[in-house]
């Protein structure tokens, strides 16, 4: 989440704590409730970023129930790039993580830790992903 806050700062976007609502991972009902909270704010967000594509489905339902259109009234973006993200209509915009490379690197670090525990230095690894451009993200409003 530190990268999210860094991205806000680097792009001159105001940090809005009321927009940061926790929801359970991979839980459409929880995401739907969180989305309703966001939509009840006087100053609604223009885009909601969900922790995973399955949660986005719950948020999308709440947006439709509120009579709003995606992306005309509000944009939504997922994270994972699971198969459902390509089958969903309108096709969702999502961040696709490179799970295979991430898993390989994690396994290599685990093996190093097991084989040389006294020499192992914990480290943070980053793996580049990609954006799946769908139809749920509008141009930023000025």
Q: Which functions belong to the PLM regions below?
A:
Residues 1-142:
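Bacterial carbohydrate/catabolite-sensing allosteric modules
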